[in-house]
């Protein structure tokens, strides 16, 4: 089988420190990376609050999270390209609705998000846009809704939380590393998801 390419972002805190991997993101099969400056020159890293882009890195992450939770009802829906975005199919609104419908009547589920701890990285592209890596946490909370009821975590959530049953509820946090192409400010082009990596980072009782 063909191994999908991975985009690595390595960060060096100072000239004497070792490089450390900040992001390791699997690219989408259809991803086309925009051109950046040659390695001999180096791509410029843009400030997190740069006004040169259609959306700042943090705003891009927040907007995409809103799409994963609301789909076409999100105010940001038309700002992002849907073609080739397999993460929406995996964890988007339809997947969340399927989780909700699979629960018994004695339990409820809520979905939320927050920015992750990793600092965003934006590298300028030759067309005045940027390749942007961001860290987003998606949070799933399952709670019993009736007295005496309980919830039963499964799979990785069960293994990481160490719980087989809970009368209080379970909260699981999934860390998303997302890679986008963000066009220049004023551009009519859409933001494109170039790749992503997702993993369960925390799980426990409420």
Task: Please report, for each region that a protein language model flagged, where it lies by residue.
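Short beta-strand edge/turn micro-motifs at domain boundaries
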Residues: 2-66, 129-131, 164-206
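Surface-exposed, charged secondary-structure patches
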Residues: 1-4, 108-153
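Generic structural motif
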Residues: 70-71, 137-143, 183-185
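Mixed-charge, low-complexity intrinsically disordered segments
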Residues: 146-169
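A short linear-motif detector with a strong N-terminal bias
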Residues: 101-102, 109-113, 157-160
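Residue-identity detector for glutamine
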Residues: 12-13, 97-98, 143, 156, ...
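Core segments of small alpha/beta cavity-forming domains
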Residues: 36-109
């Amino acid at each position: 089988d063909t191994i999908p390419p991975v985009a690595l972002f390595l960060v060096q805190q100072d000239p004497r420190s070792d490089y450390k991997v900040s992001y390791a993101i699997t690219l989408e099969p259809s991803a086309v990376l925009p051109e950046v400056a040659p390695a001999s020159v180096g791509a410029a890293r843009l400030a997190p609050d740069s006004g040169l882009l259609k959306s700042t890195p943090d705003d891009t992450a927040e907007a995409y999270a809103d799409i994963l939770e609301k789909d076409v009802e999100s105010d940001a829906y038309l700002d992002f390209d849907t073609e080739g975005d397999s993460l929406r199919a995996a964890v988007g609104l339809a997947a969340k609705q399927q989780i909700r419908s699979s629960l018994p009547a004695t339990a409820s589920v809520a979905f939320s998000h927050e920015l992750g701890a990793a600092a965003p990285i934006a590298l300028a592209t030759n067309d005045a846009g940027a390749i942007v890596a961001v860290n987003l946490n998606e949070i799933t909370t399952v709670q019993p809704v009736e007295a005496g009821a309980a919830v039963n975590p499964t799979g990785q959530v069960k293994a990481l939380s160490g719980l087989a049953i809970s009368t209080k509820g379970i909260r699981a946090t999934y860390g998303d590393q997302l890679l986008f192409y963000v066009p220049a400010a004023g551009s009519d082009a859409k933001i494109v998801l170039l790749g992503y990596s997702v993993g369960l980072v925390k799980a426990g009782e409420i």
